[in-house]
Amino acid sequence: MIFDYKTAAARTGIPGDKLDRLTAIVRAEFPDDEMMAELHILRAILAVEQGAASLEDILRQEVAG
C-alpha cells in the first residue's frame, strides 16, 4: 500500500462494504497504476472527512459517470 487510505476510511467511519465499492470503482479507472488508484481513493475519503462531499454522492457520481 502506497497511501494509507484504510486508516483514513476508518477514521472517517466509512464501512468496509462502501470502501470496497469505492476501491473497485477507482481501480477500474486506473487498472495499471496502483499509485494513482490509491491517491484517488484517499482524495475521495478526505473529501468525505472534510465535509466537501458525501460518500453516497461520490459513489453515485462514479457509477453514473
Model-derived features with residue positions:
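Short, charge-rich amphipathic interface segments used for partner binding and complex assembly
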Residues: 25-65
